[in-house]
């Protein structure tokens, strides 16, 4: 039986796969597992924090999850609508036992998900998720009377604490208590995807001094990610060009990722953003071990550019949790994914799109260069990605004919490109990726491999 927890927690179609009962059971199981942690003796009343994105299903799922936690003896702080990295940050600074966020990130509105954070704001390791799954739905000696928990609601305080933290990353308040404005005069456009950062990102950018035009920041429960945000940047590209802004930033539904647009409307992806920030950290003496942590999906062009700047790369599997694990293991300060998840360990324990936007804008100002000029230092090899659906994804690495096809293409490309087959962490599909010197060559290689995968692995 497959694991319930995927790379981003438990996800599925809300009210079909992810029901109120399942949310209740997950809250109940989580307090049993995480409440048994030896650190829980720290407080007489154990506490949890719950936040969510703007999906309409978040209301009933938050209520059910909080009910499971409070029935298990935890006091629950409902932070309301807040970005996923905001939940991680508040889990740490409010010293609660655990945090949970209800979101399906960049997925369509009908989906939703539940993801947990341990004390300190770190995502749970696989072992803890497996423990939660193992006790899911089991009966146990639940508390009664004064032993049950309460649920409190305080969106404003939670949001303001998080915004203060974000702004302080580039504009720390000095002894005079006045707020510096390092982004003063920077004209930008922010696309909030009608998601969780619809309040946070515009306010943080404005507090830092930016002149912000905001689009897609009117969530109604149904329009999250709909033709908006990092998965649909067309509106942002058009608005940047039409408004004369110097750049734009786009978030996904839970704002754990950020992509950017230069003054001409060209996309600046996560690899290029990481390259810009890694170079800035190296120049400031803050890039630990002169190393950036990337995933197998990062473009070969990024690695080649960084190598010429004296910056090494360490590669992990896809998923910001695996990036963070490697960062902690090797004491690295910066890492992330091509998709726009960027982890700046100086300020965060997970990918934070709003933090990424602030630090990227700050680097544009400090460098005196345009985003287009900065991104040009990190050229990308032409890349093609094909999703092959309805296949036996776990056989992609073992099927003899598929592996023989991979070897043929790798030999053909030599040192000028690469190929990658990656099973999806959440869907029955295999992602086939190819990079080459020309777009035509990348397309041809990817098409050939995708056909072999479909022919050999279709269910």
Predicted regions, residues:
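Proline/glycine-rich low-complexity loops and linkers
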Residues: 86, 130-164, 168, 181, ...
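Gly/Ser/Thr-enriched, mixed-charge loops and adjacent short helices
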Residues: 13, 112-243
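An N-terminal, well-structured beta->alpha segment
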Residues: 1-67, 71-72, 98, 151-188, ...
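N-terminal small/polar loop signature for handling phosphorylated ligands or for N-terminal nucleophile
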Residues: 32, 36-41, 47-111, 203-261
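Phosphate-binding and adjacent anionic-ligand microenvironments
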Residues: 246-247, 284-459
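Short glycine-centered, acidic/aromatic-flanked micro-motifs in structured strand/loop junctions
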Residues: 50-52, 190-192, 262, 346, ...
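Short glycine-rich phosphate-binding loop at a beta-alpha junction
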Residues: 41-53, 187-189, 290-296, 333, ...
